[in-house]
């Protein structure tokens, strides 16, 4: 039976019921709905709606239902209830009879669902933070094992300057640390309880909402009932965090997809995260990474969809808000899955150091070092830049690296160049000179690894 049937003289059209019902997705809030109902039953004792004995009976029945749901969650989807609130209330009435009908006193589904969703978000943020830190740790471990793996760094997908695979790993540690911070910030703002705000104007019972919030593990209660039942900022914030986090994972995936190509050949992915071709026997495809990259789009879509859903809504609750859950559930599930999969990709990745070094020595990645050398000799940087550009053209014409040009050739471009230029052009020198904070020098990379290890514990 619907929770609102008394006002109506005709039954809902079955097509409308199917269109309107949300149990097929909000069943995921079952545990939170039951936990919230236990807390609400305690609050009803404080205002005389329930006796202590009645509350104990309700709490016992709800706890039995909670264990039953955990053991067999699929039972919920076997029901034709409108939503998870109706399902829980119906099951409670089955267990305790008329007493179960007293539980909803002073409560609306508007504050109830807002509370359920916030509780679910808190639980899920905890899972995301754990997975995020696990991936950071995997990246730090990979960095530690590859501090001396020199490879080309890229701008515009053109070889630019030499870096190390460790430095590349640590770049993604920084991105993930920002993702972690965004989740922690979002958690602070969603950690306020809307329960007790009723449909929109507040409850008519003098319930201590701060005490109620504490029972549910919230930091405090919300301050405005109208805002509380309308607020979905926490959904937008988490979707935004997920969208940004998935962009980072997509870039991570794209880098490794490129590094894994035959053309680059910098890494070899484990058989555990790759698949083959049904036609071409030689293929080993980076499917895990391609799926991470591909799933980024659906998360961006969820954020955009929720923005558009909320942008024109008047206060307070509107049924449009039922659309907040499917996109949120899918986006955070996707982000969590991709965090786990990215860590699995790193577990077993092989860095092909000789090929990385060979590539770093190609493409004139040491050209900037020659320009800096000229600057140290008193040549203005813009002039040095032009001189080195001409030297690179000549080296390309001869099919040689800069360091393979004889001194006589180099001096055609500038007489200040001496024999001391050759050590400067080595890969190790290129790395060693980047010793400012955040640079690619071995000392800076080692410090960055130590800092990340200390932060992650």
Swiss-Prot record:
A Pfam family this chain is assigned to: ASL_C2
PROSITE patterns: FUMARATE_LYASES (PS00163)
EC number(s) per entry: 4.3.2.1
Transmembrane portions of the chain: none
A GO molecular function held by the record: argininosuccinate lyase activity
One annotated GO biological process: arginine biosynthetic process via ornithine
Gene3D superfamilies reported for this sequence: Fumarase/aspartase (C-terminal domain) (1.10.40.30), Fumarase/aspartase (Central domain) (1.20.200.10), Fumarase/aspartase (N-terminal domain) (1.10.275.10)
Main location: cytoplasm
Chemical reaction(s) catalysed: 2-(N(omega)-L-arginino)succinate = fumarate + L-arginine
GO cellular component: cytosol
Cellular compartments annotated: Cytoplasm
Record keywords, A-Z: Amino-acid biosynthesis, Arginine biosynthesis, Cytoplasm, Lyase
Pathway noted in the entry: Amino-acid biosynthesis; L-arginine biosynthesis; L-arginine from L-ornithine and carbamoyl phosphate: step 3/3
NCBIfam families documented for this protein: argH (TIGR00838), PRK12308.1 (NF008964)
Family to which this protein belongs: Belongs to the lyase 1 family. Argininosuccinate lyase subfamily.
Listed name of the protein: Argininosuccinate lyase
Gene: argH
